[in-house]
Amino acid sequence: MLSAGAAWQRKLATFWITTTIDTMALKSTIFKVNLQIADIDHNYYADHALTLARHPSETDERMMIRLAALAFNAYKLQSECNGDGVLAFGAGLSDVEDPDVSLTDFTGHKRLWIEVGQPEDKPISKACNKADAVMLYCFAHSSEIWWKGIETKLTRLDRLQVWRVPTLASQALAKLAQRSMQLQATIQEGNLMLGDGKDTVDIEPIRWK
């Protein structure tokens, strides 16, 4: 017969194992978006029915930055692929080898690879070898520190563009997140206005590279 102390230790161990398994088994949360894009800068107007899978470790802020990045670059579906391509979200945090957003032409070639956040230089270099163009959107308060530490390592990557989304704007984007969203995106003079009919967020990204 187990002593009271041994029984309690076994109970704690069982609880820890169960909690760990439950955490590992957490599934991505699915978000549905109807995104109406009016890109005045590039004369691109289209509705996109999108599905976002938010990884358990991904914040609403990061997820909405992915959505904003797609809106900024949706016109390339027409300009780069003549409408015959696939603009879609990748596995994101579920697979570090997969882009957050990508544009693939009808041959399966990656025309555009988009990452958000503050990745290391090696994954960025790999992305530049896999796609014609790579766009990186950073948004956190620590972005300036990250950029100072990585800028010189990215200088040689001609296919790469790096954009800084103001943190206040990215935080405001998070408040638009709903499991089902009807959003309007207007792009003019390089800026994005994203709204749901009640609230609108203005995004004026700054190009760092």
Label every model-predicted segment.
Residues 123-127, 149-150:
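A short acidic, amphipathic alpha-helical/loop segment
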Residues 101-103, 110-124:
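Conserved catalytic cores of phosphodiester-cleaving nucleases, focusing on short active-site segments
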Residues 95-105:
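N-terminal active-site wall of soluble small-molecule enzyme domains
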Residues 112, 131-138, 158-163:
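Hydrophobic beta-strand segments of well-ordered beta-sheets in folded domains
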Residues 146-206:
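Domain-level recognition of nuclease-like catalytic cores that cleave nucleotide substrates
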Residues 41-93:
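Acidic-basic catalytic patches of nuclease active cores, encompassing PD-(D/E)XK
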